[in-house]
């Protein structure tokens, strides 16, 4: 468990909440409360993934807060602030063919059908109606992630996404 392969970041710890050792959790899952499906949380600390035992986790109106074993006070739990929460990739639900988790698309090269290289996917933005690939290269491109419309193909083995998009957009 001491390397970063086969781990997926599902959230990040925020600031302490209150004085009894609770900490805010920023979920990267969609919807946000899907983070509750995973109970085998780990943090990358001292160059290795270390398990955490959740004592309590609550979804409040505007936040998710958790209490972690070994961190009973605000001063102690503040050490978790800004640490990523990871789970083993094997814990993720299987997807249908042609569906991808965001982490699988980030880092892929993006080209159009002419072979023009846009750059690499550095982020995926949710916009409500559809997700948008943020591609960094010589310039920044925002490409709607709409398979069959703008996304022609995702080649996992080559780590390339082919899009129907003009370089000048």
From Swiss-Prot:
Instruction: Provide one Gene Ontology cellular component.
Output: ribosome
Q: Which Pfam families match?
A: PRC_RimM, RimM
Residues in PRC barrel domain copies? 97-169
Q: Name one GO biological process term.
A: ribosomal small subunit biogenesis
What's the superkingdom here?
A: Bacteria
Instruction: Tell me which InterPro entries the record gives.
Output: PRC_barrel-like_sf, PRC_RimM, RimM, RimM_N, RimM_N_sf, Transl_B-barrel_sf
Localisation per UniProt entry: Cytoplasm
- Determine if rRNA processing is one of this entry's keywords: yes
The UniProt keywords, alphabetically, are:
Chaperone, Cytoplasm, Ribosome biogenesis, rRNA processing
Gene Ontology MF terms in the entry: ribosome binding
Q: Which PANTHER family match?
A: RIBOSOME MATURATION FACTOR RIMM
Can you quote the domain comment?
The PRC barrel domain binds ribosomal protein uS19.
| Subunit note | Binds ribosomal protein uS19.
Family note: Belongs to the RimM family.
Q: What does this protein do?
A: An accessory protein needed during the final step in the assembly of 30S ribosomal subunit, possibly for assembly of the head region. Essential for efficient processing of 16S rRNA. May be needed both before and after RbfA during the maturation of 16S rRNA. It has affinity for free ribosomal 30S subunits but not for 70S ribosomes.
Q: What is this protein called?
A: Ribosome maturation factor RimM
Per the UniProt record, the source organism is Legionella pneumophila subsp. pneumophila (strain Philadelphia 1 / ATCC 33152 / DSM 7513)
Gene that this sequence comes from: rimM
């Amino acid at each position: 468990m001491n390397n970063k392969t086969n781990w997926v970041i599902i959230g990040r710890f925020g600031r302490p909440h209150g004085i009894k050792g609770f900490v805010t959790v920023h979920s990267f899952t969609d919807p946000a409360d899907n983070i509750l499906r995973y109970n085998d949380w780990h943090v990358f600390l001292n160059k290795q993934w270390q398990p955490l035992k959740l004592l309590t986790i609550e979804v409040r109106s505007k936040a998710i807060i958790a209490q972690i074993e070994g961190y009973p006070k605000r001063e102690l739990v503040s050490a978790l602030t800004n640490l990523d929460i990871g789970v083993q990739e094997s814990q993720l639900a299987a997807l249908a063919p042609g569906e991808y988790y965001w982490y699988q698309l980030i880092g892929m090269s993006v080209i159009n059908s002419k072979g023009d290289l846009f750059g690499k996917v550095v982020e995926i933005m949710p916009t409500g109606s559809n997700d948008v690939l943020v591609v960094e290269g010589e310039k920044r491109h925002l490409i709607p992630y709409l398979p069959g419309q703008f996304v022609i193909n995702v080649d996992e083995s080559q780590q390339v996404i082919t899009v129907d998009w003009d370089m000048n957009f």
